[in-house]
């Protein structure tokens, strides 16, 4: 009961704004109820340590703006090889007076083509080449003990074409086809191409890729193996939020950039 009251007290500060924005965008009460339920369940699952951190951050909302904040950005594999080895570098990070560590994408990705980790196959699982979710949790806990907050890139725009949603879409599942921007012919894609710039015009020209399995054009703003998500679909918003909440339970205090 105490945990429920804590959540409701914290949520009350943002509830009206969240509900107004969600309904303005989606006009979907059922989706809103699912989102709020997921948020409550995630809060209840948070450890006492994380809830104490929540309270401290709420009492000092400007903590990250202080002049003594010093951050570093790195790819885990290039700096240390994997998450376990990165944890062994903690003395060096402390020596640098680090307070904020930003790790580039490390969630499960296809190999070898993954756009530096920005093509994500599973938003809830660390890439096996870098370690496990437990390794990430242990690293984050040790960083916090050292006064270092961990930040991860969370790739919200797209999934890998090998993500389970994309695979289900290719197999003809209409529910998951609605997770992406799909077109039967070039009418709308050609209208896009008239005004939308290309991110990689030399190596990945165009913003759409033909999917032979579906016989449809897929919006792929970056590479052909990165399928843009359709945020006009409330289920996409809710599912992506669930993955952010999942990361927050692995002791990550700042899961997104």
Annotate each predicted stretch with a short phrase:
Residues 1-238, 245:
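Acidic/aromatic-lined carbohydrate-recognition and catalytic surfaces
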Residues 248-256:
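Residue-level detector of conserved catalytic or cofactor/ligand-binding positions
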């Amino acid at each position: 009961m105490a945990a429920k009251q804590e959540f409701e007290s914290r949520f009350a500060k943002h509830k009206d704004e969240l509900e107004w924005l969600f309904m303005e965008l989606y006009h979907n009460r059922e989706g809103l109820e699912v989102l709020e339920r997921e948020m409550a369940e995630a809060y209840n699952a948070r450890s006492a340590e994380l809830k104490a951190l929540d309270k401290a951050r709420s009492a000092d909302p400007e903590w990250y703006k202080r002049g003594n904040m010093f951050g570093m950005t790195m790819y885990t594999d290039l700096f240390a090889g994997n998450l376990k080895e990165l944890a062994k570098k903690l003395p060096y990070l402390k020596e640098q007076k680090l307070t904020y560590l930003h790790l580039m994408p490390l969630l499960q990705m296809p190999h070898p083509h993954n756009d530096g980790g920005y093509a994500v196959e599973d938003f809830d699982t660390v890439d096996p080449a870098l370690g496990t979710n437990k390794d990430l949790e242990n690293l984050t806990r040790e960083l916090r003990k050292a006064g270092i907050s961990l930040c991860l890139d969370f790739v919200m725009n797209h999934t890998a074409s090998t993500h389970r949603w994309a695979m289900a879409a290719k197999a003809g599942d209409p529910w998951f086809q609605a997770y992406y921007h799909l077109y039967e012919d070039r009418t709308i894609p050609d209208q896009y191409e008239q005004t939308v710039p290309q991110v990689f015009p030399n190596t990945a020209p165009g913003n759409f890729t033909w999917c032979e399995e579906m016989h449809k054009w897929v919006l792929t703003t970056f590479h052909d193996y990165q399928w843009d998500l359709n945020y006009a679909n409330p289920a996409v918003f809710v599912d992506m939020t669930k993955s952010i909440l999942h990361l927050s339970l692995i002791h990550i205090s700042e899961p997104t950039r």
